[in-house]
Each structure stands twice: as C-alpha cells, then as structure tokens.
C-alpha cells in the first residue's frame, strides 16, 4: 500500500468520514471458500455521513445501564472533544480498539488462511486476530480479551460466518462511545460478492448494553497490489489535532 495514502485516510477517519464511493461494476465470480487478500473499506455514498464513526444513522437501542455509560463518553469525532478533553480509550491510552471498533480505523486488513484458523491482520497497530476453523464450538466461559475468542465456519461457498465472545469491557463499540459489557456477542457474516468485492453483515448482541440487536452492513474492495504497512499507536500517530478543526 502506498504510504502517501495514509494521511488522507487518517484525515477522513478522524473527521468522521469514510472513504466512500459507489462500488464499481461486478468483477469475476467469487472464488469458493476463499477470503485471502487485502481488503479496504468502500462504502456507498448513502453511508458517508456515519460509516466512518458508527454502524447506523439511527442510534442503537440502549439499556438504561448503557445510556448512562454513553453519556459519560467524550468522543473526538468531528472535534466534539479535543485531544485534551476526550476520554476515548484508544486516543488517551493507546488501548486496542477491539472488535468491532477496529473496522472504524481507516486502514486495510488482510486474510491469511492456515489449516486450523483464519488470520485477520489489521494494518492498524499490528493487530492480529485468530478465527478458529477447526470445528470447535463457541466457548461458553472464555477468558476475556480485547479481541475476544472467534470461531468461524462456511455457509455455502461464499459466506464465512464468525461468532466472537469473551470481550473485556474496556473498549467502545464505535468511535462515538457506545459501550458494551463482557456479555457482548459479535456475529460477522463475510460474504464474497465477487472476486473484488465483499460485504460484512454485523449483528451485535449484548443483554446488558443493547435492548435490541444492533445490525449493519459494511462493504469492502480487494486491493491485490497493496501490501500492509506499519501503523503504530505512538506519539506521532496521536498528533492529529489538525483533523479536529
């Protein structure tokens, strides 16, 4: 991936705008049971107003517990709060964004196949996610972590379904500060539309935080000529106050 694209992507993300264009015409047919390659967000124009920061134009249905937590969030989206006043854990402490918030970072990710699991390599902060494909069930009492424990399986030849549980409660669901608890369950349906295009259908469920499942769909484009670069949560990375003006 060309490094001169990174400042532009960063500016879009922290201004609350996604790199959004209408998907181009269909390409060759999707390969069977294969997501390998580097993917970059490419959402349609009607999602432009929100998809860089949250899942839907409408607010999710929050429980009273989550409503109180959400009121405490001081996000930096569109400069509402500055670097000196935000309490966004990613910005203030370099905490991992976790799943699903990692999708709101404006950087690509790569799928790598192995015999026992599918790896997701996110360009942001060297994040590596392991999705087990060896037939194990979704754990009922997992150790808590930033990325949770992910188990995946194929439905047909073009849809890969991932269930993730076991999150700690230190992350936000999105850049706006919607909270979650350790009961969060994230379902992702990765559907290979054709050779060059993929959509992810999200279902977020959390009985402590969400009064109803939160659903959304994001779109991605294959970038066969790109290579993942190095984006670290460092002092240089955090110096984006110019994007908040």
For each feature predicted by the language model, list its residue ranges.
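Bacterial N-terminal signal peptides that target proteins for export
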Residues: 1-10
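N-terminal signal peptide c-region/cleavage motif recognized by signal peptidases
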Residues: 15-17
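PEST-like low-complexity, intrinsically disordered acidic/proline/serine-rich tracts
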Residues: 2, 19-245
């Amino acid at each position: 991936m060309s490094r001169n694209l990174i400042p532009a992507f960063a500016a879009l993300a922290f201004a609350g705008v996604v790199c959004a264009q209408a998907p181009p015409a269909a390409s060759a047919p999707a390969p069977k049971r294969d997501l390998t390659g580097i993917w970059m967000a490419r959402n349609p124009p009607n999602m432009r107003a929100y998809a860089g920061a949250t899942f839907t134009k409408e607010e999710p249905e929050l429980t009273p517990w989550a409503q109180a937590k959400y009121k405490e969030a001081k996000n930096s989206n569109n400069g509402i709060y500055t670097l000196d006043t935000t309490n966004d854990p990613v910005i203030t402490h370099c905490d991992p964004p976790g799943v699903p918030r990692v999708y709101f970072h404006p950087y690509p990710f790569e799928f790598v196949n192995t015999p026992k699991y599918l790896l997701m390599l996110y360009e942001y902060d060297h994040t590596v996610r392991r999705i087990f494909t060896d037939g194990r069930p979704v754990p009922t009492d997992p150790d808590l972590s930033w990325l949770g424990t992910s188990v995946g399986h194929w439905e047909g030849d073009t849809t890969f379904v991932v269930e993730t549980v076991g999150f700690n409660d230190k992350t936000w669901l999105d850049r706006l500060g919607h909270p979650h608890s350790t009961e969060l369950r994230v379902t992702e349906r990765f559907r290979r539309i054709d050779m060059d295009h993929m959509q992810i259908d999200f279902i977020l469920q959390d009985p402590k935080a969400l009064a109803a499942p939160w659903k959304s769909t994001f779109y991605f484009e294959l970038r066969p000529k790109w290579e993942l670069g190095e984006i670290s949560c460092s002092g240089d990375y955090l110096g984006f106050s110019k994007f908040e003006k």
